[in-house]
């Protein structure tokens, strides 16, 4: 489709390309898993993806206002890395509250590469500007992603709480053109808290605190801040009753 929409992070327009073809992907995965008592587990996975005609973002020069981002097929691409996941209760530390606490998380460390053909991009999109980096990481790909959760469940089932931390490595958001480098979204450290109280079988009281660290989302170009979004810390209290 050639429809255009605004990216919610950058507010830049993104236009589709009618001739974009489906990406062919060959996956290779190797996984090791260990399940222990009380549901505790750990797993390690290796993966490799070989892609033909991966779908990528390219930048079209803007006459006035923000740049237009177009969607097109690159020539080839690959993604490879390792992922570790785990679930572990904290009862081994001691008695009391430790019996009600658990931690879970996953970390992915990976890399990617795509190859673009400038002339092919021009034929697909009509973009006249020369792509700066014809071999680079995939748009939106971070070399590391970390998700961690500390959870609590009460013995009587009336209370539960979780503290969740997420972070991703810098990633290309706007590919560069005409000799200018790519624009990168910087790591965003997200820390959220959710507490739930179940006074009876039908009711749930929920307290959410989002972005406790007060982090801003930032896009940089050559170590210069291109765009920043201030989100602040959000607090929400809700009540739900199921009939």
PLM segments and residue spans:
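Residue-level recognition of strand-loop junctions within catalytic nucleotide-signaling folds
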Residues: 35, 49, 89, 200, ...
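Transmembrane beta-strand segments of outer-membrane beta-barrel domains in Gram-negative
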Residues: 34, 59, 76-79
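Conserved C-terminal beta-signal and adjacent last beta-strands/turns
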Residues: 23-30, 101-104, 132-243
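Generic structural detector for well-ordered beta-strands
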Residues: 19-21, 73-75, 242
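Gram-negative outer-membrane beta-barrel transporters
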Residues: 47-50, 68-171
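Outer-membrane beta-barrel domain signature, strongest for Gram-negative TonB-dependent receptors
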Residues: 38-43
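Surface-exposed extracellular loop regions of Gram-negative outer-membrane beta-barrel proteins
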Residues: 1-28, 46-69, 166-178, 210, ...
């Amino acid at each position: 489709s050639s429809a255009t929409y605004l990216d919610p992070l950058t507010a830049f327009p993104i236009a589709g390309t009618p001739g974009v073809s489906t990406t062919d992907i060959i996956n290779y995965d190797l996984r090791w898993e260990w399940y222990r008592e009380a549901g505790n587990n750990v797993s390690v996975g290796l993966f490799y993806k070989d892609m033909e005609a991966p779908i990528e973002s390219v930048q079209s020069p803007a006459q006035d206002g923000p740049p237009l981002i177009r969607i097109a097929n690159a020539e080839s691409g690959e993604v490879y890395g390792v992922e570790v996941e785990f679930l572990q209760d904290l009862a081994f530390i001691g008695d009391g509250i430790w019996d009600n606490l658990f931690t879970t998380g996953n970390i992915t460390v990976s890399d990617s590469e795509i190859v673009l053909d400038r002339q092919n991009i021009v034929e697909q999109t009509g973009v006249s500007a020369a792509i700066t980096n014809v071999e680079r990481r995939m748009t939106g790909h971070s070399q590391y992603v970390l998700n961690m959760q500390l959870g609590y469940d009460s013995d009587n089932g009336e209370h539960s709480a979780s503290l969740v931390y997420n972070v991703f490595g810098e990633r290309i958001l706007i590919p560069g053109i005409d000799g200018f480098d790519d624009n990168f979204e910087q790591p965003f450290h997200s820390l959220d808290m959710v507490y739930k109280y179940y006074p009876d079988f039908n009711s749930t009281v929920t307290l959410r605190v989002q972005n406790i660290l007060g982090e801003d989302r930032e896009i940089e170009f050559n170590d210069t801040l291109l765009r920043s979004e201030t989100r602040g810390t959000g607090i929400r209290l809700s009540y739900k009753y199921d009939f």
